[in-house]
Amino acid sequence: MTSIYIVAEIGCNHNGDFQLAKKMVDEAKKAGVDAVKFQTFKADQLISKYAPKAEYQIKVTGNDESQLDMTRKLELPYDEFIKLEEYAKSLGLDVFSTPFDFDSIDFLASRLQKVWKIPSGELLNLPYLEKIARLPIEDKKIVISTGMATTEEIKMALKVLRDNGVMASDITILHCNTEYPTPFEDVNLNTIAGFKNIFSDYNIGFSDHSPGYFAGIASVPYGITFIEKHFTLNKDFEGPDHKASVTPDELKLLCDGIRAVERSLGSFEKLVTPSERKNKIVARKSIVANCKIKKGEMFTTENITTKRPGNGISPMYWYDLLGQAAERDFEEDQLVVHTGFKEQEV
């Protein structure tokens, strides 16, 4: 099994502060992620001055400013992104960013970005999808979130990507709910199983906006190949996404939990594992003498019983042994041996 690709979604939780963003890269590395992801945008190209805030944004940032004014404060200048990109790579992390406008697509293309994350809000943006699909970048991978979308809408977006030359094997579809945070009853992990059936030619992942790290860990047995999770250094920081993000400690628990579950999945066939083999002799039982038995005596339910250890004749041969004559003397608790009866393998 290929390890799940874990992405720490820094997004705009740096609040436009380069030093905060750099510290977040450090914490993501400590947590054990494979990559960090940012959001690249020019607020004036992304949001109209008439666009309202989302309900969750109003809840955490108030309604005194517009969505546009709020988002302007979260921009990360291109030159600072380049520095963060280089810094993250120096730590051994992959780094990529989601573009939200055409200028930002061009900028990230100039950086020869390999992984292109299409956010849920751009799923039905035809010119946006076409532009990313047509980028002449070698080994380009596309990851597409599906929050707020129906299955038919997802198929429409995938058709645009495929019609513009992107192979299904180079696309990862992320199950996603765009409510921040997503109520557990709306997470719908079973949708991942549905995706694996409907979109069997594609890679399937999970963009988790639910509280904590529980759903992320629980998604592993569904066969995901990619997971992203928003994280923050402090859930009380000003900004729209902090309260729906995990802390560095929670991010580490997510990473550790994912890796532990990956190792735990194992085989569909029930096997005796190397780690438990040594316990067979300790935990299983054998047929033993229940009292002193003289050579020639018949084995009966009175003079034999079953006790540990499990390296003698198996109790599964109980009725076969009854009525047989002892071939030697046995002391109480001594393992019974008899011609034709093998000792258990341990």
PLM feature spans:
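Catalytic cores and adjacent flexible loops of soluble metabolic enzymes
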Residues: 1-346
